[in-house]
UniProtKB/Swiss-Prot annotation:
GO terms for molecular function: heme binding; metal ion binding; oxidoreductase activity; oxygen binding; oxygen carrier activity. Disulfide bonds: none annotated. This is Anaerobic nitrite reductase Glb1-1. The record marks 138 as: Homodimerization. It comes from Medicago truncatula (Barrel medic).
């Protein structure tokens, strides 16, 4: 179930993703937080999807639960992108696609949320590696993200 056709992800795209990920990896905690701050700036209502943010009076960047969550999402997204061509499918560490799909279903994540996240991810990467950024790199990360999202969506149903 967790495998998807990755023919759309070329060797050139893989090289761009790997090169930029290698440059960003050491800052993944900071970049993950930037990603989520961008998401909430674009769509403030998305904060309601996170139980640990619902009634929090703490500024987002100081929230002790947001930082580790943001880092793990950023890491998983980027590492999934790097592995895409090598493994021929979307691979995720830590948590299975079934669990990711069930959680996204349970919390009411919809297509628009994935679109906002994609935009925020591409902006975060663009700011992280401006000297490498190009239309080709944007397309490579966009393709990798779309394939991860399609894999998650294929598992978005109530957990059994």
């Amino acid at each position: 179930m967790g495998t998807l056709d990755t023919k759309g992800f070329t060797e050139e795209q893989e090289a761009l993703v790997v090169k930029s990920w290698n440059a960003m990896k050491k800052n993944s905690a900071e970049l993950g937080l930037k990603l989520f701050l961008k998401i909430f700036e674009i769509a403030p209502s998305a904060q309601k999807l996170f139980s640990f943010l619902k009634d929090s009076k703490v500024p987002l960047e100081k929230n002790t639960k947001l930082k580790p969550h943001a880092m793990s999402v950023f890491l998983m997204t980027c590492e999934s992108a790097v592995q895409l061509r090598k493994s021929g499918k979307v691979t995720v560490r830590e948590s299975s696609l079934k669990k990711l799909g069930a959680n996204h279903f349970k919390y009411g994540v919809v297509d628009e949320h994935f679109e906002v996240t994609k935009f925020a991810l591409l902006e975060t990467i663009k700011e992280a590696v401006p000297e490498m950024w190009s239309p080709a790199m944007k397309n490579a990360w966009g393709e990798a993200y779309d394939q991860l999202v399609n894999a998650i969506k294929s598992e978005m149903k109530p957990s059994s």
